[in-house]
Amino acid sequence: MNKIILSIAVVISMCIATSSFANPEKNEIVPKQEHEEMLYPTVLVRVGNGSGSGTVVYSELNEENEYQSFVLTNWHVISSNVIIKNEWSPEKKENIDTETRRPVNVDLWEYNNYSTSVGTIGRVAKIVAYDKGRDLALLQIEDTEGQMPYVATLYPEEVDEGPWIFQTVYAVGAGMGKPPFPTTGLLAGYSRDQDGRALYLASAPIIFGNSGGSLYVYSPRDTYELIGVPSMVSAYGWGNVITHMAWSRPISEIRVFLRDNKYGFILGDEPEIAEEEEDKEEDK
């Protein structure tokens, strides 16, 4: 009799466990917030035979009742789609530089049970801004009828003095062209590049294809917020990369990049504030 009761209990517990696994919403272990705030806004950026990562940072209706959706990535990810030629201009009667920006393919992943990638939805995007020195670029999705379902939250300005060294960070990207995956580490240091622009050093490993993705912290606002765009890793010798010494373009440089290119509204700037920032830049 005891054996029968034990067998029934085992079967019931297995059914409960199976049911819980099949329906993640009933499973408190599933990190729903992490999926929605870090994993799902990550996209694959494809150019020619290469690829990198990107992050959806804005998707809202504009005054024409059309959705404007933007993806943040690295300049070096999309640089092959910007062609600059020095050509003769009959009008100016001299050689001038002409620029052509080819469209970029952006793939958004779809998931089952939160974590299982089951395919992608392709979008075409245009390169609307880039900064070679900061290694940043902004893409605009050409589809204006649909809103991007998940958008990353940018670390806000003047709310605290963070992020700080020793904070846990999460690097998310579509490394090697695979579905996005996270790695964890610490914010390990602050530095500057040879032109004096700020950099973050993090111990969260990144690999080829992670460039253009995102670096997050869990903020005092109980939200995972983007603090940087992974751009490069340290190396020594001939091609010996150190993946856990990863350098990102920090949120301070992202803000300057967006405002310099008149996309301050992505940061929440009002139009008049954006104009004031432009005037300040012109006065310098």
Located regions from the model:
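Positively charged n-region of N-terminal signal peptides that target proteins for export
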Residues: M1-I4
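Bacterial N-terminal signal peptides
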Residues: I8-I16
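C-terminal cap/linker of serine protease catalytic domains
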Residues: E25-H35, V82-N113, L226-K284
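Active-site substrate-binding loop(s) of clan PA
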Residues: I29, Q33-E34, G52-T55, E60-N62, ...
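A conserved glycine-rich beta-strand in the N-terminal activation segment of trypsin-fold
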Residues: V30, T42-N74, M245
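Gly/Ser-enriched beta-turn/beta-hairpin loop segments
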Residues: Q33, V128-R134, E145-G146, K178, ...
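Active-site-proximal beta-strands of protease catalytic cores
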Residues: P41-L44, Q68-N74, G162-M176, A202, ...
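Catalytic-histidine neighborhood of serine endopeptidases
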Residues: S59-A129
